[in-house]
Amino acid sequence: MTLSRLLFATVAALWLALGQAAPAPQTIRIGVASPTVGSPPIFTAGPFGIAYSKGWLEQEFKRDGIKVEWFFFKGAGPAVNEALTNRQLDFALQGDLPSTVGRSVGLKTRILAMQGVRTNLYLAVPPDSPIKSVADLKGRKVGIFLGTNLQLPSDRVLADHQLSERDLRVVNLDLAGIDNALITRNIDAGFTDQRVLKLRDKGLARIVYTTRGTAPRYTRQNALLVADDFANRYPDATTRVVRALVRASRWVSDPANEAETYRLWAQMGVPESVIREDLSGEPLRSQFSPLLDDFAVARYRDVADGLLALKLVRRPVAVPDWFDHRFLDAALQAEGLTGYWLPVNAAGSNVARAAPAPKAGQAKS
């Protein structure tokens, strides 16, 4: 940690601990690049979904009379970018590709913490399809959720099989649309996420390819971002929002909470067995680390380079300058969790020994 980051973290932690007066917003507006399910609306995905479902952010700011407003976007990352452009959001939970696109066109944001790393991609087809591999997609009608963090990994998988989007008949569909199109056979194949395993289990789809267990460049990342203006005006409130994500990530990583974690995640409509299968092979503590480590920076740099190479953006993005470690450092210090998560290097390997989990009651509240 640099001297400036250490100083910021120390001052912010003292602010939180001593309850000193700090500039405060009347409302905190958080945008999520995902729709809710059900009525009343349910959102439980990832650590921040747990925080939302348990009302931890509302509890954090209630004593100060600060209102927390949540906005969920069926249009995913591109819709979040539009809301950020119109200054309708202060924070955003967003995938790597759309946030990088936003940065490239001048959206002034900062990456504060990771929300989920190394998320898998699946290629699915109808169960009786003649398609046996990625190479068989040439000339086929394929669903891809364009503009989201599924697009670039899909393009990379295609490129490794000497294909590009131009070789396919690409249909821009959201994930629910891909599910429906596979069932009704309105597409020949679709690049999608873990939810398609539910269709597989019902005999409605077959998995042709998955990025599980492959190189990190094929995976997708999600992060918490803040609007520059908000972070500059309200550094204390920004740290407290990050602190809520840190608490949620710590809660998810605790084996004592595993059963409830999967139960809550399954409320999004994906069976617990499917979620467990998708996340198998690596502890939740690693998959939901909030750290802005070398791996996170490398993945976003790779996305920025990939977008530029594919001419999906016109201007390069200075990725390291986009990551603001200070708020996460302060939140980890305030929660007594500095060293709890294991940093990962750019290649995806652990680079240090993580601190043991704090005993019950050790983490500061």
Region spans (language model):
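Secondary-structure end/capping motifs
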Residues: 37-38, 234-316
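Flexible hinge/capping segments at coil-to-helix
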Residues: 126-141, 232-236
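Short, polar/charged alpha-helical segment
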Residues: 27, 37-68, 85, 103-105, ...
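Short loop->beta-strand "edge-of-pocket" segments that line small-molecule binding or catalytic clefts
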Residues: 29-45, 135-147, 247-251
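Pocket-lining segment of extracytoplasmic ligand-binding domains
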Residues: 129, 171, 176-269
